[in-house]
């Protein structure tokens, strides 16, 4: 009888050990994608792209090469398109966006774009053209300035003080981001990664301060990339921080850096 008890105890210990080892293995796989796997390649590609953040002086883009596909002409140095936009919809109210896009032409070493304010209709999710405001801007000496007279001093000041996320965002701890959800489409090619962030994350704190985001909900980070995973050059990089996402209530921030053919 004593022998059977010892045997049963031994079997229980073995089963428990195997179970714990299995859990640890699954945890390691979720937190740290296996080296050489598609997930690891995606994270490595984003790591290379995000390593350029921040670029405080936008004029540095004039000397930065990007991923070139078949649409680029041989003599075209390409254009960087950078965008940053905050989207807010308080509960039960209209969705409003405000942001800027800038075309940085490497051929002419000039940069121009728009500062845009929009309202989004809840019925069809389209821009209400009657409520859209668009102001032309240009970059001179790493400063954004309006190209036309603006009577609204508040908007004028907002334009002149505007900073793109690429100028202050910092992903030095990206390698420590765990439990990512990955997807990959080799045909396009496009790929993505999603992470749950914490409120003490540097970028989260920056966005809360700059855009007066009062909610205490922890945001999700969605990264979307385009181009060859094995190529170190940037083709397209989209970043989205989602703070609130509910029917009739939304707060999220969009940022993108894209290398496109010059027009």
Curated annotation (Swiss-Prot):
Protein name per the record: Uncharacterized lipoprotein SAUSA300_0415
Range of residues in the leader sequence: 1-22
Keyword Cell membrane: yes
Principal place of residence: membrane
Covalent lipid adducts (S-diacylglycerol cysteine), residues: 23
The entry's keywords: Cell membrane, Lipoprotein, Membrane, Palmitate, Signal
Family: Belongs to the staphylococcal tandem lipoprotein family.
Lipid addition sites, N-palmitoyl cysteine: 23
One of the record's GO cellular component terms: plasma membrane
Membrane topology (UniProt): Lipid-anchor
Species annotation: Staphylococcus aureus (strain USA300)
Source lineage: Bacteria, Bacillati, Bacillota, Bacilli, Bacillales
Cellular compartments annotated: Cell membrane
Pfam family, one: DUF576
InterPro entries: Csa (IPR007595), Csa_sf (IPR038641)
Glycoprotein in keyword set: no
